[in-house]
Amino acid sequence: MEQKRPQLKARVDGDYGEFVLEPLARGYGVTIGNPIRRILMSSIPGTAVTSVYIEDVLHEFSTIPGVREDVIRLILNLKELVVKFHAPGPKTLTLRAQGEGEVRASAFEVPTDAEIVNPDLVIANLAEDGKLVMEVRVEEGEGYVSADKHATKDRINSIPVDAMFSPVRRVAYHVENTRVGQQTDLDRLILRVWTDGSAGPQEALDKAVEILRDELSVFGNVEPMPALESSYAAATPAAVYDPATATLPASVYDSPRQPDLGSLSINPQPFPTDQDTPRVTLEGLGLTTRVLHSLKEEGIDSVDALCALSDRDLKKVPGIGERSLDEIKQQLAQFGLALRD
């Protein structure tokens, strides 16, 4: 019986999208869902803050008179800034604030070919005598780029910032059983996508499928390997191994020598796991700014260090409660990682 062609149904609500693909042949739910999820998490282009200049600040470990947040906290807040480009090329955002009160992202002066998606984001809190002047550079890119990779000398005392460009915040998928008529051994793929608002879930999914299609298209243009063809063509029937007639040399059967097992040195190497080689940085886990700051205050600055801790260890970290612990576990699980038992 001919299988029904799969159909895709979508439900998009702002920066959240749910996509259902069915019916699929048994096993194809995972075959399709896993690569799309990996591409969504790693390869969708987006924008991010790459450097910041703050007036009268020389380095990221400084404090600013009249500003409650130190420079590290300001940078963490700026990493949450979401900017949507309407034209290519880096953009410079300028902020000038003075006097008591909150400073929100809406206070930035933004070029006409860009917009801030989250204008209510709190950047800083100023005292009555506080003053904050800064320039923020926003660029386009893919995945995670460390600060040293895009350090710029365009502005003296500019502080480079490690950037997570992906507009996709989280991706989850699972496969269910489904049926069509009497055929019950079919898959239903359910894919859920959360974005930061600079790109919609449908747009991100379309881009992921385009990337996957381009990568697989190479298999449609296979070129012959002359060296391989010539070696096979030159082979005679006698040179081709035939298991029915092949025999070992007589010396193998007649030799009285036995292998010296005592000389063997068995030194097995541990098989590397995802825990040993994290695939993402601490910033790339998608943790909230508050949780990320609490971890870094305790010197937990890598995924490897985080995964070496247990639930009990993390509860001792100031600012980490049950809700924060659940958030950390959920974000680690998205990358196949977990805390120590």
Curated annotation (Swiss-Prot):
Residues 268-341 are annotated as: Alpha C-terminal domain (alpha-CTD). GO terms for biological process: DNA-templated transcription. Pfam families: RNA_pol_A_bac, RNA_pol_A_CTD, RNA_pol_L. InterPro entries: DNA-dir_RNA_pol_insert, DNA-dir_RNA_pol_RpoA/D/Rpb3, DNA-dir_RpoA, RBP11-like, RNAP_asu_C, RNApol_insert_sf. It is an enzyme of class 2 (transferase). The keyword Transcription applies. Keywords: DNA-directed RNA polymerase, Nucleotidyltransferase, Transcription, Transferase. GO terms for cellular component: cytoplasm; DNA-directed RNA polymerase complex. One of its GO terms (molecular function) is DNA-directed RNA polymerase activity. It catalyses: RNA(n) + a ribonucleoside 5'-triphosphate = RNA(n+1) + diphosphate. Homodimer. The RNAP catalytic core consists of 2 alpha, 1 beta, 1 beta' and 1 omega subunit. When a sigma factor is associated with the core the holoenzyme is formed, which can initiate transcription. The N-terminal domain is essential for RNAP assembly and basal transcription, whereas the C-terminal domain is involved in interaction with transcriptional regulators and with upstream promoter elements. NCBIfam families: PRK05182.2-5 (NF003519), rpoA (TIGR02027). This is DNA-directed RNA polymerase subunit alpha. It comes from Deinococcus radiodurans (strain ATCC 13939 / DSM 20539 / JCM 16871 / CCUG 27074 / LMG 4051 / NBRC 15346 / NCIMB 9279 / VKM B-1422 / R1). The gene is rpoA.
